[in-house]
Amino acid sequence: MPDMLRGAGYTTHHVGKWHLGYVSEQAWPIQQGFDSFFGFLDQFLLRGPHTDAGYNLKRPTYVNPLLQRDNGAFEKHTGHLSDILVEEAIDLLGRVKEQEQPWFINYWTYLPHTPLTPATRFASKFPDTPEGKYNAMLMQVDAAVGRVLATLDASDLTRSTLVIVVSDNGGTEKHLPSNQPFIGAKNTFTEGGLRTPLLMRWPEVIPKNVVIDETVSYLDYFPTLESLV
C-alpha cells in the first residue's frame, strides 16, 4: 500500500501499532514504504526491547510506553499511549497540510486491546469492572478519532480527505463476552471474530448516514484506493 501510494506521489506515514513483523528490520515500516513512523513494532515492545531473558511483563503497556521513531531506538514517553499517539497524528496533520504533495496517514491506535487500561479521566465515568474499563477504552477511542476529525475540519482538509475507521478483529472473550449476539471471538472464523464496523467519511463523495449491507474484505482496500489515486 505505501509503495503504491508513494508511486502515485503521496507521502506516507504510520502512527501507532505496527504488528507486521519486527525481528528483521526489513519488515519495519520505513523499509516497507513509509516515509515516517512513530509507534511500536509489537505490543510487547511497549514494555521494552526483547532480550534473551524475555521482556518485563510487570511493566505497564499503556502508561509511559517505550516508542520508536523511524528506525531509531526505543524512547520512553510520558503519559497514556492513546494520548501520545493522537497528539502525534494531529501534529502530523499540521505538517502535511503545508506540503504540496497528497498524503496518507495510517493511524493504528492500540485501544481497546487488553490489558484493559483506560486513562483515568475516562475510567472515572464507568464502574471499576472489566465491562466498565472496556467501555471507558471505547470512549477513549471515540475521543481520539473525534480529535482527528476536528483537526481536519479546523485545517480545511475535510473535503479533500477520505477517512476510514475500521477494526482488525472482533473482541476477545478473555475478559467479557463482547461480541454478542455474534458467535465466536478473536482468532475464530465466525462472525464474532471477523465481523467488525467499517466507517468512511468523504464529504461530497460519500453520502451521509448511509448503511451498506455488502460484505467488505481487507483485500478490497488496496484496489479501491489504487483506483482513487
Label each residue range with its predicted role.
Residues 1-229:
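Formylglycine-dependent sulfatase
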